Amino acid sequence: MQPLVLLLAFLLPPRAEAGKIIGGHEAKPHSRPYMVFVQILVKETMKMCGGALVREDFVLTAAHCWGSSISVTLGAHNIQKRERTQQVIPVRRAIPHPDFNHNNMSNDIMLLELARKAKQTVAVRPLSLPWSKAQGDSGSPLICKNVIQGIVSYGRTDRTPPAAYTKVSSFLPWIKKTMKSL
């Protein structure tokens, strides 16, 4: 029976989101109100990343998720559909860590200052900061007990281990200083 199910899984047409999360499942709608869809224009090509709302006016993502024009979508469950809970906000300024190295991906962390504050709703809420590589996953948060611990940085293109994360707590002084100064 299992081989038949596996065979059928390969024969079925893939959905748009298929294959991005290995071994995962669809989340309950709006159960992760801090999750952000980041769209980036790079050389006339739209790219996508994930991120986390860490304040009403800031999103935390990976520094390699940079481009000439960036916008974020908050409050989405299905990014393929326009939902009444969605808020699309342009990014005023992208602030990569000053020591980000694109060659070795060290310090791969960036703050996105939003052009306007996100309206907090049941579908949109900031994630707590710790106080005291499938395409599209870059910049997404690694969360433990509702506190952001890491940002997806890079991994193998065949989606097998290892993957690398930027440790958020190592960058708290920079994050706090940057958000306070703007």
Where are these regions (language model features)?
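Extracellular "complement/coagulation-type" protease architecture
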Residues: 1-182
